[in-house]
Amino acid sequence: MIGRIAGILLEKNPPHLLVDCNGVGYEIDVPMSTFYNLPQTGERVVLLTQQIVREDAHLLYGFLTPQERTTFRELLKITGIGARMALAVLSGMSVQELAQAVTMQDAARLTRLPGIGKKTAERLLLELKGKLGADLGALAGAASASDHATDILNALLALGYSEKEGLAAIKNVPAGTGVSEGIKLALKALSKA
């Protein structure tokens, strides 16, 4: 299983890439969210990958963030969703937008994606509910409360608090608060709980 590729980006043709790793060129398909954030050709790139082995092909899919790869893997577990469809979902909306759509059970938002009809959207909502990680949907909502929600959450997790406790505490942090002040406010909220 190939889990990570680091090398020189040789070609970029949406959604395909060619990455040279010590003289071996790997063809990798990426969602557009990853494609738009890639360096220029000739520069070094590091991608997290998902290898899919079929009877007729060995395919690599690449992602810049662990959240994208995890979401891709969750999408593949859904009946009727293959790698191409999962890539289309991640190309059409961010992981946070998908998590919000699942949390709000917003099928209309998903049907705007190419290849996703009403029944597929409903199946996605049903099967992804609670599987994208509590932090994705809740953190998307908490991000409006604090610009540094991820950093604050990571600090709270490092201090031994659960993800659920951390997310609840972040909701008490006002927008525009710095990381250190946000951690103090979150800890204060946790001490009262």
Curated annotation (Swiss-Prot):
Region (Domain III): 144-193
Region Domain II: start-end pairs: 65-139
A biological process from GO: DNA repair
UniProt-annotated stretches for the region Domain I: 1-64
Keywords for the protein's UniProt record, in alphabetical order: Cytoplasm, DNA damage, DNA recombination, DNA repair, DNA-binding
Coiled-coil segments: none
Cytoplasm as UniProt keyword: yes
GO CC annotation: cytoplasm; Holliday junction helicase complex; Holliday junction resolvase complex
DNA damage among keywords: yes
Cellular location(s): Cytoplasm
MF terms in GO: ATP binding; four-way junction DNA binding; four-way junction helicase activity
Renumbered residue ranges of the record's region Flexible linker: 139-143
Gene3D superfamilies hit by this protein: 5' to 3' exonuclease, C-terminal subdomain (1.10.150.20), DNA helicase RuvA subunit, C-terminal domain (1.10.8.10), Nucleic acid-binding proteins (2.40.50.140)
Oligomeric form and interacting partners: Homotetramer. Forms an RuvA(8)-RuvB(12)-Holliday junction (HJ) complex. HJ DNA is sandwiched between 2 RuvA tetramers; dsDNA enters through RuvA and exits via RuvB. An RuvB hexamer assembles on each DNA strand where it exits the tetramer. Each RuvB hexamer is contacted by two RuvA subunits (via domain III) on 2 adjacent RuvB subunits; this complex drives branch migration. In the full resolvosome a probable DNA-RuvA(4)-RuvB(12)-RuvC(2) complex forms which resolves the HJ.
Record function comment: The RuvA-RuvB-RuvC complex processes Holliday junction (HJ) DNA during genetic recombination and DNA repair, while the RuvA-RuvB complex plays an important role in the rescue of blocked DNA replication forks via replication fork reversal (RFR). RuvA specifically binds to HJ cruciform DNA, conferring on it an open structure. The RuvB hexamer acts as an ATP-dependent pump, pulling dsDNA into and through the RuvAB complex. HJ branch migration allows RuvC to scan DNA until it finds its consensus sequence, where it cleaves and resolves the cruciform DNA.
UniProt domain comment: Has three domains with a flexible linker between the domains II and III and assumes an 'L' shape. Domain III is highly mobile and contacts RuvB.
Name of the protein: Holliday junction branch migration complex subunit RuvA
Protein's organism: Burkholderia multivorans (strain ATCC 17616 / 249)
Gene name linked to the record: ruvA
